[in-house]
Amino acid sequence: MHASKRIARKTRPFRKLPLAAAVALAFAPQAWAQSADAQASPDKQARTLDTITVTAQKREENLQKVPISLQVLGNTQLEQQNVAAFNDYAKLIPSLSFGTSGGGVFSGPGFVQLYMRGVASGNDANHSGSQPSAAMYLDEQPITTITGALDIHMYDIERVEALAGPQGTLYSANSQSGTVRIITRKPDPSGYSAGFSVEGSKIEDGGIGHVLEGFVNVPINDHAAVRLVGWQKHDAGYVDNIHGTRTFPTSGITIDNAARVEKDFNDADTVGVRGSLRFDINDNWTITPTLVAQKMKAHGSTGVDPNVGNTDFGYDPSSAELAVKHFYPESSDDRWHQAALTVEGKVGNFDLTYVFSNMKRDVDSEADYADYGFWYDSLAGYGAYFYDDNGDLINPSQYIQATDGYKRTSHELRIASPQDRRFRMVAGLFWQQQSHDIFQRYRVDGLATDIEVNGWADTIWLTAQQRKDRDKAVFGELSYDLTDRLTLTGGMRFFRNDNSLKGFFGYGDGFSGSTGVSQCFSSEQFHGAPCVNLDKGTHENDHIGRVNLTWQIDDKKMVYATWSEGYRPGGINRRGTLPPYTSDFLTNYEFGWKTSWADNKLVFNGALFRENWDDFQFSYLGQNGLTEIRNANSARIDGLELDLAWAATYNLQINGGFAWYDAKLTANYCGWLKPDGSPETSCPAGTVDPNGNVVSGPLAANGTRLPVTAKFKGNLNARYTFDFHGGEAYWQASVAHQGDRTNDLRDAQSAVFGKLGAYTLTDLSAGWKKDSWSIDVFLKNAFNTRGQLARFSECAALTCGQESYTVFAQPRTLGLRFSKEF
């Protein structure tokens, strides 16, 4: 899925369908209903909305009783909305924004970079950057790694819970701005069940994809059951790698990508399995081990060159609209598994829960990095520094070969008092350790031996390092019913974070005297590197809190007020001249409501909030393309979130979610720290920075809008069901809108990239279900909108930004799915 400027293209027959006609088609089932077996009888007008049970506060509760801005997509809604991956449900959750990132150096599918409530500073950094500010969980297990979260295949899923706002009291460090929880269906000893689904789809001007998935639930006896889930899918491509050439100014060398030309080259193949066992030891104790594993092989770039068709950039004017001109292989081989164990039981009247999880992920990736060499040669003549053993200038293009290994282990032990008591508590201990083994080799074919990284042929830059992050915490919340309808809750989390980074990064000593081998202080060949020039660590101790007052006006209406804090751990910078960056904190002031109306036919929930983000972390590419992380300054996010569900008639149900955000800096960002370590905020034109440079003003002024998040995001879904030939048929239309966004915090970089334009995506579907089987036809992105999701360049924006890449929403896709349950 991708985004960029709409470019004129040939009119296609389907695009001639007017919006009014499409809407009329989606909401006018009379032609089918006239032949239905029976019309809705009068007693069918009493349909109400289903009660939704959640575990957001680590205990089972009615959604309407939980004093959190919480949006839930249940199993039925996930199936009805054809949700198969993160991008599908992200557009249905207004508080959720995201970036795109593949595994390793790959720019295709893989990791999920999620943000909530506008808490995003934007960055062009790579590895060794800040941890995510929002967390993702699979059941009880965190699946957010240092680089991002796993993109879970959404099949046999019970629900998705999106908790907006700081959740750091009951959840881990990455829950600074919110938490997304994916809850799977559990083994059921009460009976056998199974099902499968077969899906085929065609992307307009793209390839053909398919999905095969199934599950089986097998009782072993009255106290135990096994549930197995499997999937295999092919995501079709729709971006072409087209023919082109490139000439380097310094050497005059011209390269050609004829051997890499391929249509629809950004495809992916995925296979996965999930298995879980439930064993009821007795009436009070249950053990549930789970294993989920997936392998994905992806190719090509999801980014599209907006200059396609422009002859000044070497393109044929008749080139395909969604295309790039890349010269080197781009792929990712991504394998991961996570094992977990959940033990639930009772100690007296108290509920005791222990959760263990262990995740391992390995990614082999390769990426085109030719833009780096071309633009540095064009702007600064850097091509003169790349030669062979004969002293002749060579093609300075680079490509990257990388291996990334991720490990994460966590333990949580918590105890909860009975829910029906006037005084209630939840308390626990949490420990986790995660590591990222990074090996990235930047290659230039034919490079002279005396300027390559020592011992690594054709390698201009090598990164071989290991990052470790450890978190320990003790947490708890106490709730007291002041009256039958007024409850006061307070919570605290005390934590310690440790971060370390060891290894090698940089050039060979024949190429640079300031970065790489020349800076080594140990001859240890760490992970195959020639030596060690980095071995640093840091740690922090602190605490955060939460206070909530909830008033249950009556059984159907509740209001609450919350003060809460969230944090994100700090860490170290690879560049030795930079100090560690510290944890950043988010303080939330929130007023919310949960209400049901018209005999539970209408649910209207919402929250109004202000969040202060202090000393937030900002990652960017500095000198030599090296990631630097600074505590920038402060920002404020004001927002309003609304959630609506309406059973309008027995046949028609409407759901919607909307969010408005005003996220901006509250002080100048100058780009350096004061002697006391705090961010400098006063830097008018003419100020001399610590490096002796005269600046023209702040990099981002007070009042600058925070990037990534739109000022408005919303979605609306309408589903009409009716009897048809002994079964139930439906028509459905979904509309998701997102406003424009900036791409970078800094003014100069933001100006280079420009804004990501606002867009509206429309999905249509229809289907029929009878007994245990169903058939669905769907049309995603029905009007083939070029929704702009993200924009990036291969190197720093001020160098390579003239050749940026835009990630678009997947073009119009027609699909057919057959499902059967037993």
Give the location of each predicted region.
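Gram-negative outer-membrane beta-barrel transporters
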Residues: L488, R610, N631-L745, R817-E821
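Transmembrane beta-barrel wall of Gram-negative outer-membrane proteins
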Residues: E204-S301, G405-H411, I415-Q432, Q466-S479, ...
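Membrane-embedded beta-barrel scaffold of Gram-negative outer-membrane proteins
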Residues: E213, A340-A370, Q552-R568, T582-A647, ...
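Solvent-exposed loop segments that connect transmembrane elements
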Residues: Y238-D264, H299-F327, D368-Q401, R441-A464, ...
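Short acidic/polar hinge/loop motifs at secondary-structure boundaries
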Residues: N126-H127, S133-A164, G214
